[in-house]
Amino acid sequence: MVYYEIIKDIVFTYNLQFTHLIHNDRISEVNLGGVTMRSIITQICNGVLHGQSYQSGSNDLDKGNSEIFASSLFVHLNEQGKEIIKHKDSDDKIVIGYTKDGMAFQIVVDGFYGCERQAVFSFIDNYVLPLIDNFSLDLTRYPDSKKVTESLIHTIYSLRSKHAPLAEFTMSLCVTYQKDEQLFCAGFGIGDTGIAIKRNEGTIEQLVCHTEVDGFKDAFDNYSSANIDLVIERNSVFNTKVMPGDELVGYTYVPPMLEMTEKEFEVETVDGKKINKRIVRHLNLDPGNFDDKDPLFSQLLQVVKSKQKQLVEQAKETGQIQRFGDDFTVGRLVIPDQLLINQLRIHALSIGVSDGLLSYIKNENENKGFLGIYGFFTGADKNIEKATLYKNLIAKYQNNHFISLIILSALVSDSKTPLMTQYLVGYLDFPSKALLANKITELLLKELENPDMREILGSRLATDVIEELETKIIRYIHNPAGSDIHSTLNLWTADKIKAATNSSLTI
């Protein structure tokens, strides 16, 4: 649970095999002592260029449950009310995604003004994002969510000090987890970013407050690193039960008139023999600006636009130099239901297996020896061919959850490829082949609860269909020229229900 004692030399990469899906499918990967962890990234924004804004598109992977908007609310006017142009690219970053177990998360980051923005962005990618899977798992494993979250905060401070001392930023972070068949969301906020939740029934609650300390802010920086426990104590750590459909909105800044003071208190700090007293304020979104019907995300964008226009008009009338505002980035994440969670888990596993097959192919190519002349004698050529066929099938049907699982199940049960299967078991960090097979079966049984799947299957028994398809996939892998597997698999799509239920599935 104490990450900073066990995590060493974390490395972050995007899965280059899927760069053609870069706007819809980002995979984060990290090696923790040989354990490969993967997350699905559905939305990401690394700031915006001066004078530009960014509105993310919908992502089919999570059924449009995530969005990001980014712009700048910086205003600098001269005495005549004319804009003073000063080029500044924004230093905000938001990442929205799901762990390999389908648990939703959101990371909201605001880099310091004038900071090394790329250092901030890289640190989040390389060192924070890879921690999310274990954070969610530990929240499930251990009873004290507050201690788990505080451990994560210590980890981030430790990693920053060691690997990215030039990265200075404030941050809010949240992740969901399952315990006792219920969904929860836990996380924290250090500094002036915030996270609010709009419940299904319309209630808005603040999970992470915008926190001020004597008018300034704590942060992930050298100054705050000197007393991390005190920083944690006066900022936000939370844990709350959530339901599918609840909306999590993270933001880096809103105009002050949209906030209200939720709490103000005094803390003491000791500097040598001197005792300093500091005033801490927790600021929330003022719920009076929002209704209980429309999404909080869209309401916040509209209210901010209106208030910003009002502020600019007032500033122009003063006849004085005016400077105010900040970068403005906001993210929306809707808690997925169990069906979508299962489908996200399927997708993550499919990508993991595909990546494992790529690694296996690379390994077999190395085993072929100088100029590859020993490939025939070692069997590497045959192994590479079979692994490539499986990999191509997974890539082709990755958006069909049922077929994806059938392919994975066939791969694991293929008695003629024991070395490849064993390689994948180790690559995916499963203790045994049986446990990997059980994982696939568990996901398959849950996918069969999907009403669309029941309609597709019609009167046919699922076990018969699964066994028949597995057999034909394995037959294709070992004799690709003698079968047309795609004609069979293409029957099992939503737009060919009738053909699927009436077909004898003869290749």
Curated annotation (Swiss-Prot):
It comes from the Bacteria. One of its GO terms (cellular component) is host cell perinuclear region of cytoplasm. Signal peptide: none annotated. It is an enzyme of class 3 (hydrolase). Gene3D superfamilies: 3.60.40.20. One of its GO terms (molecular function) is small GTPase binding. It is found in: Host cytoplasm, Host perinuclear region. GO terms for biological process: protein adenylylation; protein deadenylylation; regulation of GTPase activity. A divalent metal cation binds at D92, D110, D192, D271, D326. It catalyses: [Rab1 protein]-O(4)-(5'-adenylyl)-L-tyrosine + H2O = [Rab1 protein]-L-tyrosine + AMP + H(+). Its EC number is 3.1.4.-. Keywords: Host cytoplasm, Hydrolase, Metal-binding, Virulence. Pfam families: SidD_C (PF21513), SidD_cat (PF21511). Virulence effector that plays a role in hijacking the host vesicular trafficking by recruiting the small guanosine triphosphatase (GTPase) Rab1 to the cytosolic face of the Legionella-containing vacuole (LCVs). Acts as an adenosine monophosphate-protein hydrolase (de-AMPylase) by mediating the hydrolysis of adenosine 5'-monophosphate (AMP) to 'Tyr-77' of host RAB1B, thereby releasing RAB1B from bacterial phagosomes and rendering RAB1B accessible for inactivation by LepB. De-AMPylation of RAB1B cannot take place when LidA is bound to RAB1B. This is Adenosine monophosphate-protein hydrolase SidD. It comes from Legionella pneumophila subsp. pneumophila (strain Philadelphia 1 / ATCC 33152 / DSM 7513).
